[in-house]
Structures are given as structure tokens and as C-alpha cells.
């Protein structure tokens, strides 16, 4: 008992020496005792203990951009310049501001991603976007109203006026595939835009109640979607940078369409879209030995519909125009694909 009493007395004396208990306070925190012991240890070792003042602490900001600038001011550039440009363009931001370096653009991208994360989630549904655009046009017409006697053109689609006829295009088609690539591209562009105009005029000639129906909206949205799908193809044709294999296949398709040989045009389309290569995506070597069918793996036999999403879209748009061409410019049933199915 004497040993226990002496230990209690020693502990009590230690607390009094440390000044842990002030007036009207019956307890203390163990962290305070540890802090006092640490200070006493430093004093015995000859170190000077500088008290930390709360006023010297930097104020924390609720703005994540300011916190990023303070904490990661010299963050290394972890993305390539091409990736930074791609991400900025996806978010509708300029790829470079005036006087901005590559590192500054990278830092700007990080701030944008922190403030507005995930602008576009997943792949966009093009058909739904076209339908929403048609619905928005109807809403604008309802809100804006219409004057009596005014012609209703709110529901009409844009028509490409090519100022040409099918007879003139058929005459031009005789010179397709003769070696003049620039002339072939001009004829292809003119004919595809002519078909888009024919399709739009057909849809615009419908009654108003048909345009407003579910099926009518779907048909209008399909035409708008096809037009947007073909824009990359028109751009390549205008800039003369369409790949040679794609250009050759499309030339054959257009030539057969102008001759109203729709079965042959469909065969040429399948040859371009699907191909007949044993490795349609373009595998060139498996293992250490060349395969027996390797000589067939070149651009003419590759399935172009598998190359990328842009090619898949304008190939699909081309097939829709083939159907429209057969519908408006019929021929013998033996030369048609799915005769009377339209």
C-alpha cells in the first residue's frame, strides 16, 4: 500500500509541476501531458521550442481551383498535347489562349475538369438528338405563333438546290471511273446532294398532320441524321483527301445507281462495307510465320465499316440514299433490291 500511495503522490506532483490543472478544472487531456513532456525533453537537450500560433496558418479556401493552384502549382504535365487539345475541344473550349504555353493549357484543362466534370457521358444518340431538334422546331412554332395567310414552313427540311436533273446526272455518270479523280468526286458530291434534296422535298410535301405524327417526326429525324452522317464524306470530297479504296468503291456504287443497276450497286456496297478478307480488321501477322491468306489482307478487302465510327456513319448514310434512289427512280424488278418493300 505504501508503494501505491507513493506512486499516486508522485503522479499528482508531476501534474502540478506541469501546470496542467488550472482553477476550476478537475481533469486534463493526455495530449496536453505528452506535449508538456516533449517540451521538457527539448529543453533538456538544448533545443529552443517555438510556439505555433494559429494566426500563422493559411486560410483554407472552399474554391477547388485555388486549392489546386496552392497544392499543385508545379504539377508535371501528364498528358500529351494532342490529348489536351482533344479534351478541350470536347468541352467546347479553345485549344490555346493568347500567350498561353502548352503547360498553361494543361493547367486550364485541369481546372475545367475539376469545376465541370463529365460534360458528355457516354456516346451520344444521334437519332434522339435529331428527334429532339424536330420537337424543338415544333415548340418554337407554337411559341412564336403564325400570322393568318402565312405559309407554314416551320416543319420543312432544308433542301439542297443543285439546279440539276437526273438526266444530266446520268449523262455525267458515263464519265465516272475514267481516271479523273477530281471530276469523279465532283459528280459523287453533286449526286448525293441531289438525292438529299429529293428526299427533303418528298418529306416537305407531306400534310402538316403527317409531319407532326410520331412516324412523320421519325422520318424527318432520319433525314437530318443522314445529312449529318454524310458531312464528313462531303468534306473529304471537297478537300480531295478521300482514301483511294473508299473513293473507288463509292465511284462504282454511284455509277451503278445512275445506270439503275441497284443489285450491282448493293453488291458493291457490301464489298466496301463488309469486305471478304479473312482478317477484316487488319491483322497482319499472327505468330512468327506468315499465314496463307495474308496476301489478301489489303485495303480493298478490309471491312471499312469496322475502321472507325465516322466511316461507319457515312457508309450507313450512303445506304439510305441508295434506298431513296431506288424508290424515286425505279427500274425493272430484276434490277431492284427488295422490290416493292419500300
Curated annotation (Swiss-Prot):
SMART domains linked? SFM
Indicate where the modification N-acetylmethionine is found in the sequence: 1
Q: Which domain of life is it from?
A: Eukaryota
Q: In which tissues is it expressed?
A: Detected in brain, heart, liver and skeletal muscle.
InterPro entries, A to Z? Prp18 (IPR004098), PRP4-like (IPR014906), PRP4-like_sf (IPR036285), PRPF18 (IPR039979)
Its Gene Ontology biological processes?
A: generation of catalytic spliceosome for second transesterification step; negative regulation of protein metabolic process
One GO cellular component, as annotated:
U2-type post-spliceosomal complex
Give the UniProt subcellular location, in the record's own words: Nucleus speckle
Question: Is Membrane included in the keywords of this UniProt record?
Answer: no
Which Pfam families does the UniProt entry name for this protein? Answer: Prp18, PRP4
Keyword list, A-Z: Acetylation, mRNA processing, mRNA splicing, Nucleus, Spliceosome
**Task performed by this protein:** Participates in the second step of pre-mRNA splicing. Down-regulates the expression of potassium channel subunits.
What the record says about family reads: Belongs to the PRP18 family.
Q: What is this protein called?
A: Pre-mRNA-splicing factor 18
Please report the organism this UniProt entry assigns to the protein.
Rattus norvegicus
State which gene encodes it: Prpf18
